[in-house]
Amino acid sequence: MSNAASPATSAAPVRHYPMSCRTLATQEQIWSATAKCAKQIAEDYKQYNLSDENPLYLLCVLKGSFMFTADLARFLCDEGVPVRIEFICASSYGTDVKTSGEVRLLLDVRDPVENRHLLIVEDIVDSAITLEYLKRFLQAKQPASLKTVVLLDKPSGRKVTLSVDYPVITIPHAFVIGYGMDFAEAYRELRDVCVLKKEYYEKPASKL
């Protein structure tokens, strides 16, 4: 699936955040795009005869994708897709705005996933270094299938060749926060996806 939406322009409640210079996607626009993506996933996975005994495993990549995973799970439920949720954590970022290029696995899935249908759920893909690492790591566990769904795709930032199976929204190059995504662990609680003002990530994290 490559027909990701661009940031929507439909009417939605206007929320203002002092650390944001603009909003890329409101909570309501995210929900609309995620619901559409869930319908496509449900259609594509019919071939696997999913059931409570053969569910779709959503692998929530912590920390940033926790809100997206929760909403996606509910929209998949609306489409009749049985899911299980597992958590995994790997990062090529520290508290800076640039990737280090070195991926560290911080948390592995707890359940055995051999012969299971796995869907990696990411908040954002920029360089794709972390997602490429996770795909290789999880493929070694011999799942029945392995695909990726990403809320925000930034193709212009790629440092490795990688295509996302289900990109929900395509965004331009920008440092974004909100809807689970952070800068130095701040701003995850914002309802919308916003662009962080430059002066915020140029100041020490202790001053946030």
UniProtKB/Swiss-Prot annotation:
Gene Ontology biological-process entries: GMP salvage; guanine salvage; hypoxanthine metabolic process; IMP salvage; purine ribonucleoside salvage
InterPro entries the record matches: HGPRT, Hxn_phspho_trans, PRibTrfase_dom, PRTase-like
Disulfide bonds: none
Listed GO CC annotations: cytosol
Cofactor(s) listed: Mg(2+)
Intracellular or extracellular location(s): Cytoplasm
Amino acids binding Mg(2+): D182
A GO molecular function held by the record: hypoxanthine phosphoribosyltransferase activity
E.C. numbers: 2.4.2.8
Principal EC category: transferase
Keywords: Cytoplasm, Glycosyltransferase, Magnesium, Metal-binding, Nucleotide-binding, Purine salvage, Transferase
Pathway, per record: Purine metabolism; IMP biosynthesis via salvage pathway; IMP from hypoxanthine: step 1/1
Leader sequence segment: none
Catalytic site positions: D126
Ligand binding (GMP): K63, E122, D123, I124, V125, D126, S127, A128, I129, T130, K154, D182
Catalysed reactions, semicolon-separated: IMP + diphosphate = hypoxanthine + 5-phospho-alpha-D-ribose 1-diphosphate; GMP + diphosphate = guanine + 5-phospho-alpha-D-ribose 1-diphosphate
Pfam families according to UniProt: Pribosyltran
Cofactor, how bound (note): Binds 2 magnesium ions per subunit. The magnesium ions are essentially bound to the substrate and have few direct interactions with the protein.
Protein origin, superkingdom: Eukaryota
CDD domains attached to this UniProt entry: PRTases_typeI (cd06223)
NCBIfam families: HGPRTase (TIGR01203)
Job of this protein: Converts guanine to guanosine monophosphate, and hypoxanthine to inosine monophosphate. Transfers the 5-phosphoribosyl group from 5-phosphoribosylpyrophosphate onto the purine. Plays a central role in the generation of purine nucleotides through the purine salvage pathway.
Family according to the record: Belongs to the purine/pyrimidine phosphoribosyltransferase family.
Name recorded for this polypeptide: Hypoxanthine-guanine phosphoribosyltransferase
